[in-house]
């Protein structure tokens, strides 16, 4: 399955861009849920795609933050 943005493209982002992208995707999820509740949503497959992208970005963010911290 080819998503609009792949993990390779996400790896090019810095931490602030990742945070902005996560916020945008979470807003998109909220909008999808609202459309679903009002029976206006025809593209239910987008839930899975967006949730997967959020998970990928959170994983990438966590790995970047742990690699930047010095070992104690």
Curated annotation (Swiss-Prot):
GO MF term list: structural constituent of ribosome
Gene3D superfamilies: 1.10.287.310
Record carries keyword Ribosomal protein: yes
Cross-referenced SUPFAM superfamilies: Ribosomal protein L29 (L29p) (SSF46561)
Name the record gives this protein: Large ribosomal subunit protein uL29
Swiss-Prot/TrEMBL GO biological process terms: translation
Matches recorded under InterPro entries: Ribosomal_protein_uL29, Ribosomal_uL29, Ribosomal_uL29_sf
Keywords for this protein: Ribonucleoprotein, Ribosomal protein
Pfam family, one: Ribosomal_L29
GO cellular component, as recorded: cytosolic large ribosomal subunit
Similarity section: Belongs to the universal ribosomal protein uL29 family.
């Amino acid at each position: 399955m080819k998503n609009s943005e792949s993990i390779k493209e996400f790896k090019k982002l810095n931490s602030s861009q990742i945070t902005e992208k996560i916020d945008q995707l979470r807003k998109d999820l909220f909008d999808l849920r609202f459309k679903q509740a009002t029976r206006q949503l025809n593209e239910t497959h987008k839930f899975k795609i967006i949730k997967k992208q959020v998970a990928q970005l959170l994983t990438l963010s966590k790995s970047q933050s742990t690699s930047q911290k010095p070992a104690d």
